[in-house]
């Protein structure tokens, strides 16, 4: 079975891969761009979505994405980490990295798989 994890641009690619192929059985997207409603309707993989609370550009697409996943009957989990910035899991970026949120999100990701 195939699963994928992506961060930022890579998170958006996980969303697109899930829409493009039934081969993906599980996907985890960290603060990636949401697919269109048409793309989301094609997703069959289980999905886990992680978002930063302080990420208006990415988060503006989340409600429509989640509604499309629900309408398509996709099993998904979505988490918003309040008070953290986009790229909160990137420990090479001290201005954005949040160790507590990163550890929680990664633990959830490992548990998901």
Placement of each model-derived feature along the sequence:
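A short beta-to-alpha transition loop/helix N-cap that caps and shapes the active-site region
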Residues: 34-39, 57-58
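Short alpha-helix in the alpha/beta-hydrolase fold that links the catalytic acid
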Residues: 59-69
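Alpha/beta-hydrolase fold nucleophile elbow
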Residues: 1-7
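C-terminal catalytic histidine-bearing segment of alpha/beta-hydrolase fold enzymes
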Residues: 70-113
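Short beta-strand/loop motif that positions the catalytic acidic residue
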Residues: 43, 48-51
């Amino acid at each position: 079975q195939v699963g994928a994890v992506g961060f930022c641009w890579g998170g958006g690619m996980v969303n697109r891969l899930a829409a493009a192929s039934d081969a993906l059985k599980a996907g985890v997207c960290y603060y990636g761009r949401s697919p269109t409603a048409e793309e989301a309707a094609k997703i069959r993989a289980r999905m886990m979505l992680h978002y930063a609370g302080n990420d208006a550009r990415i988060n503006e697409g989340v409600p429509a994405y989640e509604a499309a996943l629900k309408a398509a009957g996709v099993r998904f989990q979505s988490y918003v980490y309040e008070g953290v910035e986009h790229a909160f899991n990137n420990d090479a970026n001290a201005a954005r990295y949040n160790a507590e949120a990163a550890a929680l999100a990664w633990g959830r990701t490992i548990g998901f798989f």
